[in-house]
């Protein structure tokens, strides 16, 4: 560190506008900090401004500070740290590593015309006295402990519903999957149960296991409570040593592994407290084998394994509006560019079971607007989606029904069309038709009306200048009523207009090797329709009493001359007097 008065600005700071702005900061700080202002000369040569100084307060106190300016200054704020013991000050404003919260976290609180000197003058005393403004959010210590281990690709899964207050120690039964990767030792694990010191059961996992935790190796490891556990500080070895304890190792994939868990009361949300989980790990890698003495081992290496929460309340916490999908079964017919994104979004948002029907194969040409990529080439669409969904969204089970509606069955020994449709629609709560085939839509309308099921149909115009998402209540307008509403018997427009381009088939193409003409359109336009389908499904299942009349939502995406932002209109669809669904 060099005194500011002796500091010669290097070219990295002197020749750029951002560098000159940093130098102006030094002048302002020097006016208050005086001779205490020191500049890291080595960092400055690389264009980094790192400084230390003593800041005088109006009450006579002088506070030692360190500041580092990001490369993105002045658009983003400098980071300021205490050089004294931060435990003397309120922890909500002064982190255990000394970081000061002079402003709220949101970047909007810092403006490019502000200076650190002005900020310290206005806010430092309030921060140190605990009288400054606070962000209305919790300070969970597990987040900071997890950050020490995120580069490893490892995790342990827990459930926020477990209540362990009043207990000091015990054991956890852990399903452990260990492997050696390019980035080091990877541990993927899930706690199956939590027990007190006397063996009594305190909590048990009910969430389905993700595919990444596929091991059958269940091991018992210790847990203990430490409500005085602080944020991680100091050297990595000292820090991890606080939580990496225990004596029992298990052998996994060429290494001896020891896990230990520390539970600490923490602020999970603003002024709401609960238990934080921290996982310490020690690994002894096997480096060679001896016929007499067994494997030789490297020294133990302690580390942190991030703890993540994947219980039912944890998965749905960020989006409470999709709670209606839990416990529901939804059938999706047609898994092309409209149906595949809808199926994945329904799974992502918590649908318990999907029944998927298609009989097409994913080809390379599909990939430009299909939901999955090259790893699915050559796979039946329903099978590819089943594998993907059950691997990535383990709370959703998938029934894949291979069938193309309308094909005759010439073999009495295999299930026929009626059998396949019964399998598809068994116990479902809602049907989504993404077949883009009017005949199939009419058939599903008939079947859903007979079964008392609601149907959502989605389709796009051949040139993708528009499309529609239609809700059909079993006692309101059906797909045939929709056809009557679009066009009169004389060929004139009905009271519900077609989407733009609906009757323009001039842009249909037949790619080489494809047996059918197909529409031209991009995934980013098609997803407008797929996502509206999911929104409608969530709304219908959330408030079924409000959805007693069929409804047509028509979107236009193109005005012939150019693409435009989606423009929606909504029309009720009553039963048409000329439709047989009235009888």
UniProtKB/Swiss-Prot annotation:
GO terms for biological process: cyclic threonylcarbamoyladenosine biosynthetic process. GO terms for molecular function: tRNA threonylcarbamoyladenosine dehydratase; ubiquitin-like modifier activating enzyme activity. InterPro entries: ThiF/MoeB/HesA (IPR045886), ThiF_NAD_FAD-bd (IPR000594), Ubiquitin-activating_enz (IPR035985). It comes from the Bacteria. Keywords: Plasmid. It holds the Pfam family ThiF. Signal peptide: none annotated. Gene3D superfamilies: NAD(P)-binding Rossmann-like Domain. This is Uncharacterized protein y4qC. It comes from Sinorhizobium fredii (strain NBRC 101917 / NGR234).
């Amino acid at each position: 560190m060099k005194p500011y008065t002796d500091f010669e600005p290097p070219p990295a700071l002197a020749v750029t506008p951002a560098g000159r702005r940093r130098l102006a900061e030094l002048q302002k700080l020097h006016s208050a900090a005086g001779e205490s202002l020191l500049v890291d000369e080595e960092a400055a040569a690389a264009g980094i401004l790192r400084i230390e100084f003593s800041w005088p307060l109006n009450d006579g106190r002088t506070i030692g500070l360190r500041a580092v300016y990001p490369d993105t200054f002045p658009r983003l704020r400098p980071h300021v740290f205490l050089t004294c013991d931060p435990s003397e000050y309120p922890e909500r404003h002064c982190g255990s590593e000394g970081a000061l919260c002079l402003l709220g976290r949101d970047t909007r609180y810092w403006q490019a015309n502000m200076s650190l000197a002005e900020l310290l003058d206005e806010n430092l005393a309030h921060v140190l006295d605990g009288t400054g403004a606070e962000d209305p959010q919790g300070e969970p210590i597990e987040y900071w402990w997890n950050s020490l281990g995120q580069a490893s690709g490892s995790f342990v899964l827990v459930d926020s519903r477990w209540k362990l207050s009043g207990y000091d120690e015990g054991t956890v039964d852990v399903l452990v999957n260990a492997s050696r990767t390019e980035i080091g030792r990877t541990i993927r694990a899930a706690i199956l149960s939590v027990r007190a010191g006397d063996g009594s059961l305190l909590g048990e996992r009910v969430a389905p296991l993700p595919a990444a935790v596929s091991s059958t190796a269940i091991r018992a490891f210790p847990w203990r409570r430490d409500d005085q556990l602080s944020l991680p500080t100091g050297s990595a070895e000292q820090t991890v040593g606080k939580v990496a304890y225990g004596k029992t190792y298990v052998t996994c994939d060429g290494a001896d592994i020891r896990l230990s868990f520390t539970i600490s009361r923490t602020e999970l949300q603003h002024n709401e407290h609960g238990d934080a989980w921290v996982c310490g790990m020690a690994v002894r890698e096997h480096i060679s084998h001896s016929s007499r003495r067994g494997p030789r081992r490297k020294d133990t290496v302690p580390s942190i394994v991030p703890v993540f929460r994947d219980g039912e309340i944890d998965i749905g916490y960020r989006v409470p509006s999709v709670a209606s999908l839990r416990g529901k079964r939804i059938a999706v017919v047609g898994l092309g560019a409209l149906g595949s994104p809808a199926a994945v979004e329904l799974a992502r948002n918590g649908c318990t079971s999907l029944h998927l029907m298609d009989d097409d194969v994913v080809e390379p040409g599909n990939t430009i607007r299909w939901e999955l990529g090259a790893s699915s080439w050559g796979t039946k669409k329903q099978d590819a989606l089943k594998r993907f969904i059950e691997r990535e969204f383990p709370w959703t089970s998938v029934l894949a029904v291979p069938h193309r509606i309308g094909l005759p069955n010439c073999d009495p020994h295999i299930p026929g069309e009626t059998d396949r449709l019964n399998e598809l629609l068994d116990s479902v709560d809602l049907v989504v038709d993404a077949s883009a085939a009017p005949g199939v839509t009419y058939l599903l309308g008939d079947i859903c009306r007979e079964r008392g099921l609601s149907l959502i149909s989605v389709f796009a115009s051949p040139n993708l200048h528009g499309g529609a998402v239609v809700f059909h209540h079993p006692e309101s307008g059906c797909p045939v009523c929709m056809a009557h509403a679009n066009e009169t018997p004389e060929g004139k427009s009905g009271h519900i207009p077609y989407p733009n381009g609906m009757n323009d088939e001039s842009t249909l193409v037949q790619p080489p090797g494809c047996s059918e003409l197909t529409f031209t359109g991009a995934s980013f336009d098609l997803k407008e329709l797929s996502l509206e389908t999911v929104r409608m499904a969530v709304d219908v299942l959330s408030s079924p009493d409000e959805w007693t009349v069929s409804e047509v939502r028509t979107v236009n995406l193109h005005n012939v001359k150019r693409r435009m932002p989606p423009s929606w209109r909504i029309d009720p669809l009553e039963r048409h007097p000329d439709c047989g669904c009235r009888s």
